[in-house]
Amino acid sequence: MNKLIIALILLFFFLGQSVRGQEDNIKVSLMTCAPGTEIYALFGHTALRYEDKARGEDWVFNYGMFSFNTPHFIYRFVKGETDYELGVTRYPYFEGSYAMRGSSVYQQTLNLTISEKQELRRLLEENYLPENRVYRYNFFYDNCTTRARDVIERCIEGKVVYSEGKEGLSFRDIVHQYTKGHKWDELGIDMCLGSEADKPIDARKQMFAPFYLLEAAKKATIVVGDSVRPLILHEKKVVDAEPENVGDGFPLSPLACVFILIGITCFVGWLQFKTRKIIWIWDLLLFGVQGLAGCVITFLVLFSTHPTVGSNWLILLLNPIPLIYLPIMVCRAIKGKKDLYHTINVVYLTLFIMIMPFVQQKFNVTVLPLALCLLICSANHVLLYYRQNNKCCLLYTSD
């Protein structure tokens, strides 16, 4: 009888040690990578690391895999139909790639039970099945960071509770935090985002950005009944690096370029006023670029499934109308016919500039001077017509 009791005690002891050893051997971590210099890397990256020392496994699960070689990649990206997929790589390769590009990597070890770790592995393996690994990417709502957060929450038996995020932040505010020093990239993104991107968002929506998830995870807790434990056991920087500061690769900022355009437009207007002749090449360039940019924005507003782009008030300034009307304008001028385009454009652009402060959208700093540039160009034509006809009339006929 005593031998049986001793045997049972030893059995339970070794079973406990086995389970404890199994738990100690498995470690799951949230990996947050610092921003890189390429536009697709400006916001950083998130991945999951799964370590099982007993099996010699050390894998990184990455929901941010995509290929530029995908057929019609640019068109699909603009339309909001880009597909990303879950990729798996060995940790040393993952660490080395970020060290090579100069991006620091932070590791937050998750405070999970053995059953939760096993469930997380099962979910990741299920996600990695060929029929499950590909997903439709959404920059704000379904990306590599939100996917990592969601799969962590799914494996936890209780509930993850986050602290409140920063008040008053919008998607555009967070984007601007990551585009500092990259003014041309910031301009391109700003031109695409509409007024919806300027609405305040809650803590959960702020987690689309990798470092916002990192900060949220630090303060998060796991609640199971009356039990509360921190989500993160500990954090460390596994790659300490600084990216090469390459900036935009262009010496002039967008704002400087727009002011140069204003200067050239004023000079062209002076030449036209002095010679009483229209310099058409400048009109073709200025209104052509306005129309082409307008085609892109109109396409985004009407056809793209990207979030926040459908409410873009910038379409009032940048639309295809100048590009469509430009040939008509030139033909009417050559035939000596009257044309009200520039007169209407002066009134229209004046009204646009006046309503800008009241529109619930944060325009890029280049928008106002750009509108002024286009206004000056049209005003030059109106003044030239007045000079040519020597009377107070806001119609013009070209020579």
List each model region and its residues:
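Extracellular structured ligand-interaction cores
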Residues: 45, 58, 107-109, 145, ...
